[in-house]
Amino acid sequence: MRPETPAKSHPFTRPTRRAALTGLLALAACGPIAFGGAEPRIDATAPVTVALLVPAGSTVQGNDILAANLENAARLAVSDLQGVQIDLRVYATQGDPAVAAQVARQAVNDGARIILGPVHGAEATAVGTAVAALGINVLAFSNNPAIAGNNVFVLGLTPDNAARRVLSYATQNDRGQVMIIGERTTAGELMLAAVNRAAIDAGAQIVATETYDFSQQGIVAALPQMAATARSSGAQSILFTADSAGALPVLTQLLPDNRIAYPQFQFMGVTQWNVPPATLQLRGLQDGWFTLPDPAVTQQFESRYAQAYGATPHPIAGLAYDGIAAIGALLGTGSPEALSRGSLVQGSGFVGVNGVFRFLNDGTNERGLAVATIRDNAVVILDPAPRSFIASGA
C-alpha cells in the first residue's frame, strides 16, 4: 500500500446496512459540543485533510494486513459521512517510531489538521512529540493509557474500561470481594494496576492478589498458593488479567480441578473471552463474566466491511472507523475549533462501530461496554452496553 492512496469507491449490495452505519455517523456526536483551545483552526465548510498513519512497510508479519484493514475501515467511514468533506491521506510508518515522526511532520506540511493513528505506543509517542508544537492532535489506535496525554489520545479499549465495567457489575450483583490473578510481566503489572484503579471507581474490594511466572511451569508452581488464597481470603470472585492467547485457558482448567470454581467463585476477566471464537469452548469459562463492545453495532460493521472488501475485518479495524466518526461529527458542527483539544474531550462523546465512546482529559477514553457470560459455548449478554453516556448516568 502506498502513502496518500486516492480514495476508491466500493459497491454495496445491501443499502439498508449502509444506511444504518450512515445513521451512526449522523448521530456520532451524542450531544452539544463545548469548544475550547485556539488550535488547530479549520474551515469546516471546505475539505479537511486528515492523516491516517498505518504500519505498512514493516518487517513484522501481519502489519501490512493490519494497515490495509485500518485504511479500508477509515475509507468506509469517510464514504458514510454526510455534510462533511474529509481528504484522507495515508502514510506508512513501517512500524518505526522515527519514520512515524517523519511522516507525521510531512502530513502536517501536506495540510493535515489531525492525525489518526499510529498503532503502536512508541510510534504514537514519537508522533505526538513531533507535531505538538504545531497544535495537531493525535488519535492513536493504541490501548495503552501510559502513552496518553497532552496532544495524544488513545482510541483502543483500555484495560481500565473493561475492569471498571466488570467490577461495577460484580459489585451490583454481590460479587464485589475480588481476588486478582495476574502474570509477572510488564504487561501483567500494567493490567494489575488498571484493575486496582478500577476497583476504587467501582466500589469493589480487592481482597487478595496472586501472581505467577509467565510459563506453564510457573502457573503449575503457583497453583497451590492461588487455591489456598482463594479459600482463605473471603473472595467472592476471581478476576483474571490473562487473555485466551496467554494463561487464561490453563488457569481456568487447573483451578476447577483444584475445587476453585463457579458457583462458589465467580470467574471474570478484563479481556474479550469471545476472541478467538474457539475460546468459547473452554469448560472453565462457562458462566464467567467479561466485557465486550456493543455486539449489535459491531456485527453491523463486520457485515458491512465484509460486503465491501470480501473479508472479515481485523479486530482493531473498527477503531479507524470510530476515529473518522468522531472527526466527522466534530467537523459537522462547523466550528473553526472543531478539532481542538477542548472539542475532542466534550463529555457527551461519540457513536462508533464499537458503541459509544468519549475522550477524557488525560487522553484516555471511556467506552460503553456490555457485560456478557458464556453459556453452552455461546455468548449471552447479561447487561447491555449503554447507548449514550447521559443515559448511563455519566
Residue ranges and their predicted role:
Residues 248-321, 334, 385, 389-392:
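Extracellular/periplasmic periplasmic-binding protein-like sensory domains
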Residues 1-15, 19-29:
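N-terminal secretory signal peptides
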Residues 31-34:
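Bacterial signal peptide processing site
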Residues 137-139, 146-168, 182, 282-294:
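Short beta-strand elements at the ligand-binding edges of bilobed clamshell
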Residues 38, 69, 80, 84-146, ...:
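Beta-alpha junction/loop-to-helix N-cap segments that form part of ligand/metal-binding clefts
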Residues 156-211:
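An alpha-beta-alpha
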Residues 309-324, 328-383, 393-394:
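Segments of small-molecule ligand-sensing domains
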